């Protein structure tokens, strides 16, 4: 099994853009991937405002991010998820405030953007016919796989539950209670 995360995709996307300074609302893996890609993390005149997952978001971060975006920094989101397990605010919720204040929408690199699927397949030198996408969110993970023609696995240990499937026009290829129980990979 090979994994390609939204943090990896964000760094790969940004390597192809002009500018190497970023104001980051995020933690761990995202910051690590950005450093590996040669970015400087700063709150002085950044080229990008990058929003990922964090549990330490505060008003000062929102103010800085919105100010930088309103003044020309390119606004990037790792994903559009509004909340995660336990209903904690996620990237999409954090971006909503920045968007309202700055008047600019983020470019979403992660699922359901087709960009992450193409980048993942290229990075892994894989083909859609032999690739499975695993996720806990019908609106992002499973939608991305469906749109890319991939087999999909919905795990019920996160955002989406069995009842949610009936609300969508598409269906996952397989459904498992958790990642630990997947036996097709």
Where does each model-flagged region fall?
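Asp-based, Mg2+/Mn2+-dependent phosphohydrolase catalytic module
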Residues: 1-185
